[in-house]
Amino acid sequence: KYCLGTVGLLDKCTFRFSQWDPANPNNKYEGTKEQWDEAQRVMGQILDDLDVKYEIGIDEAAFYGPKLDIQYKNVFGKEDTLVTIQIDMLLAQRFGMYYIDENGEKALPYIIHRTSLGCYERTLAYLIEEYAGALPTWMAPEQVRFLPVTDRAADYCADAAKALESQGFRVEVDYRNEKIGKKIRDAQMEKVPYMVVVGDR
Protein backbone atom coordinates (compact mmCIF):
# COMPACT_ATOMS: atom_id res chain seq x y z
CA LYS A 1 0.00 0.00 0.00
CA TYR A 2 2.85 2.37 0.78
CA CYS A 3 4.53 1.83 -2.61
CA LEU A 4 1.27 2.21 -4.53
CA GLY A 5 0.48 5.35 -2.56
CA THR A 6 3.92 6.78 -3.28
CA VAL A 7 3.39 6.59 -7.05
CA GLY A 8 -0.20 7.83 -6.76
CA LEU A 9 -1.95 4.59 -7.68
CA LEU A 10 -3.43 3.33 -4.41
CA ASP A 11 -6.79 5.07 -4.83
CA LYS A 12 -7.07 3.80 -8.40
CA CYS A 13 -6.62 0.13 -7.52
CA THR A 14 -8.87 -2.58 -6.13
CA PHE A 15 -7.79 -5.60 -4.10
CA ARG A 16 -8.95 -9.10 -4.98
CA PHE A 17 -8.40 -12.05 -2.64
CA SER A 18 -8.15 -14.83 -5.23
CA GLN A 19 -9.21 -18.20 -3.83
CA TRP A 20 -9.63 -21.71 -5.15
CA ASP A 21 -12.97 -23.23 -6.10
CA PRO A 22 -13.63 -25.97 -3.52
CA ALA A 23 -16.44 -27.33 -5.70
CA ASN A 24 -13.93 -28.22 -8.39
CA PRO A 25 -10.63 -28.87 -6.58
CA ASN A 26 -9.23 -31.36 -9.10
CA ASN A 27 -9.59 -29.16 -12.16
CA LYS A 28 -6.40 -27.12 -11.89
CA TYR A 29 -5.45 -26.92 -8.21
CA GLU A 30 -2.80 -28.92 -6.39
CA GLY A 31 -2.56 -29.57 -2.66
CA THR A 32 -5.09 -30.82 -0.14
CA LYS A 33 -8.29 -29.16 1.05
CA GLU A 34 -6.68 -28.73 4.46
CA GLN A 35 -3.72 -26.89 2.93
CA TRP A 36 -5.98 -24.59 0.95
CA ASP A 37 -8.25 -23.87 3.89
CA GLU A 38 -5.31 -23.03 6.15
CA ALA A 39 -3.49 -20.89 3.56
CA GLN A 40 -6.66 -18.93 2.80
CA ARG A 41 -7.47 -18.54 6.49
CA VAL A 42 -4.00 -17.13 7.21
CA MET A 43 -4.02 -14.81 4.22
CA GLY A 44 -7.51 -13.57 5.04
CA GLN A 45 -6.49 -12.91 8.64
CA ILE A 46 -3.44 -10.92 7.52
CA LEU A 47 -5.54 -8.82 5.14
CA ASP A 48 -8.10 -8.16 7.86
CA ASP A 49 -5.41 -7.26 10.39
CA LEU A 50 -3.97 -4.76 7.88
CA ASP A 51 -7.45 -3.37 7.23
CA VAL A 52 -7.25 -4.14 3.51
CA LYS A 53 -10.62 -3.80 1.81
CA TYR A 54 -10.90 -6.61 -0.72
CA GLU A 55 -13.35 -8.58 -2.77
CA ILE A 56 -13.18 -12.35 -3.06
CA GLY A 57 -12.50 -13.96 -6.42
CA ILE A 58 -13.52 -17.63 -6.41
CA ASP A 59 -11.58 -19.83 -8.84
CA GLU A 60 -9.05 -17.02 -9.42
CA ALA A 61 -6.21 -18.55 -7.36
CA ALA A 62 -2.99 -19.91 -8.81
CA PHE A 63 -2.80 -23.70 -8.99
CA TYR A 64 -0.31 -23.69 -6.09
CA GLY A 65 -2.04 -21.34 -3.66
CA PRO A 66 -4.24 -18.31 -2.92
CA LYS A 67 -3.13 -14.81 -3.81
CA LEU A 68 -3.89 -11.14 -3.43
CA ASP A 69 -4.27 -9.47 -6.82
CA ILE A 70 -4.10 -5.70 -6.99
CA GLN A 71 -6.17 -4.72 -10.01
CA TYR A 72 -6.47 -1.57 -12.07
CA LYS A 73 -8.42 -0.52 -15.15
CA ASN A 74 -6.53 0.82 -18.13
CA VAL A 75 -7.75 3.71 -20.28
CA PHE A 76 -9.87 1.29 -22.30
CA GLY A 77 -11.64 0.03 -19.17
CA LYS A 78 -9.95 -3.39 -19.24
CA GLU A 79 -8.96 -4.74 -15.84
CA ASP A 80 -5.36 -5.86 -15.45
CA THR A 81 -3.29 -7.15 -12.55
CA LEU A 82 -0.70 -4.63 -11.40
CA VAL A 83 0.72 -6.44 -8.36
CA THR A 84 0.21 -9.93 -6.99
CA ILE A 85 1.20 -11.49 -3.66
CA GLN A 86 0.95 -15.27 -3.67
CA ILE A 87 1.19 -18.09 -1.16
CA ASP A 88 2.93 -21.05 -2.78
CA MET A 89 2.18 -24.33 -1.01
CA LEU A 90 4.14 -26.55 -3.44
CA LEU A 91 7.52 -25.03 -4.28
CA ALA A 92 9.23 -25.84 -0.97
CA GLN A 93 8.23 -29.48 -1.27
CA ARG A 94 9.54 -29.71 -4.82
CA PHE A 95 12.90 -28.24 -3.80
CA GLY A 96 13.15 -30.27 -0.60
CA MET A 97 13.06 -27.20 1.63
CA TYR A 98 12.10 -27.42 5.29
CA TYR A 99 12.53 -25.72 8.64
CA ILE A 100 12.73 -27.03 12.19
CA ASP A 101 9.55 -26.28 14.13
CA GLU A 102 9.10 -25.66 17.86
CA ASN A 103 9.01 -29.42 18.49
CA GLY A 104 12.35 -30.00 16.78
CA GLU A 105 10.64 -31.63 13.79
CA LYS A 106 11.07 -30.92 10.10
CA ALA A 107 8.18 -28.87 8.74
CA LEU A 108 7.31 -27.69 5.26
CA PRO A 109 7.31 -23.91 4.75
CA TYR A 110 5.09 -22.00 2.37
CA ILE A 111 6.80 -19.63 -0.05
CA ILE A 112 5.50 -16.10 -0.57
CA HIS A 113 5.88 -14.59 -4.04
CA ARG A 114 5.68 -10.80 -3.91
CA THR A 115 6.85 -7.53 -5.38
CA SER A 116 6.33 -3.98 -4.16
CA LEU A 117 5.20 -2.61 -7.52
CA GLY A 118 4.70 -5.70 -9.62
CA CYS A 119 6.24 -5.91 -13.07
CA TYR A 120 8.11 -2.62 -13.47
CA GLU A 121 7.42 -2.44 -17.20
CA ARG A 122 3.67 -2.88 -16.67
CA THR A 123 3.60 -0.37 -13.80
CA LEU A 124 5.54 2.20 -15.82
CA ALA A 125 3.26 1.66 -18.82
CA TYR A 126 0.23 2.23 -16.59
CA LEU A 127 1.75 5.39 -15.10
CA ILE A 128 2.54 6.78 -18.56
CA GLU A 129 -1.00 5.93 -19.62
CA GLU A 130 -2.55 7.39 -16.46
CA TYR A 131 -0.63 10.66 -16.66
CA ALA A 132 -0.74 10.87 -20.48
CA GLY A 133 3.06 10.91 -20.47
CA ALA A 134 3.30 13.93 -18.14
CA LEU A 135 4.74 12.13 -15.13
CA PRO A 136 4.94 13.93 -11.77
CA THR A 137 8.14 15.96 -11.48
CA TRP A 138 9.75 13.62 -8.95
CA MET A 139 9.20 10.68 -11.30
CA ALA A 140 10.03 12.32 -14.64
CA PRO A 141 13.26 11.04 -16.23
CA GLU A 142 14.10 14.64 -17.16
CA GLN A 143 12.87 17.20 -14.66
CA VAL A 144 14.32 20.46 -15.98
CA ARG A 145 15.46 21.52 -19.43
CA PHE A 146 17.40 24.72 -20.03
CA LEU A 147 16.67 26.41 -23.34
CA PRO A 148 19.32 28.96 -24.33
CA VAL A 149 17.98 31.55 -26.75
CA THR A 150 21.46 32.30 -28.14
CA ASP A 151 24.89 30.72 -28.02
CA ARG A 152 25.90 33.43 -25.54
CA ALA A 153 23.48 31.96 -22.99
CA ALA A 154 24.78 28.39 -23.34
CA ASP A 155 27.58 28.71 -20.78
CA TYR A 156 25.21 30.13 -18.17
CA CYS A 157 22.76 27.27 -18.85
CA ALA A 158 25.55 24.71 -18.44
CA ASP A 159 26.61 26.18 -15.09
CA ALA A 160 23.02 26.39 -13.84
CA ALA A 161 22.37 22.81 -14.94
CA LYS A 162 25.42 21.58 -13.02
CA ALA A 163 24.24 23.43 -9.92
CA LEU A 164 20.84 21.73 -10.09
CA GLU A 165 22.39 18.33 -10.83
CA SER A 166 24.53 18.68 -7.72
CA GLN A 167 21.27 18.91 -5.76
CA GLY A 168 19.97 15.67 -7.29
CA PHE A 169 17.83 17.04 -10.11
CA ARG A 170 17.78 15.44 -13.56
CA VAL A 171 18.64 18.24 -15.96
CA GLU A 172 19.40 18.70 -19.66
CA VAL A 173 20.45 21.67 -21.78
CA ASP A 174 19.13 22.01 -25.33
CA TYR A 175 22.20 23.19 -27.23
CA ARG A 176 20.66 22.68 -30.67
CA ASN A 177 20.88 25.46 -33.21
CA GLU A 178 17.11 25.85 -33.38
CA LYS A 179 14.69 28.71 -32.82
CA ILE A 180 13.48 29.04 -29.23
CA GLY A 181 9.90 28.33 -30.29
CA LYS A 182 10.90 24.89 -31.59
CA LYS A 183 12.90 24.14 -28.45
CA ILE A 184 9.89 25.01 -26.29
CA ARG A 185 7.53 22.99 -28.47
CA ASP A 186 9.83 19.94 -28.39
CA ALA A 187 10.14 20.12 -24.60
CA GLN A 188 6.35 20.36 -24.29
CA MET A 189 5.87 17.36 -26.59
CA GLU A 190 8.39 15.39 -24.51
CA LYS A 191 6.49 16.30 -21.31
CA VAL A 192 9.44 17.91 -19.55
CA PRO A 193 7.96 19.39 -16.34
CA TYR A 194 10.08 22.55 -16.19
CA MET A 195 11.57 24.60 -19.04
CA VAL A 196 13.99 27.42 -18.26
CA VAL A 197 14.39 29.90 -21.12
CA VAL A 198 17.63 31.88 -20.88
CA GLY A 199 18.44 34.85 -23.10
CA ASP A 200 20.43 38.06 -22.99
CA ARG A 201 17.82 39.70 -20.78
Place the predicted regions along the sequence by residue.
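NTP/phosphate- and nucleic-acid-binding module
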Residues: 1-201
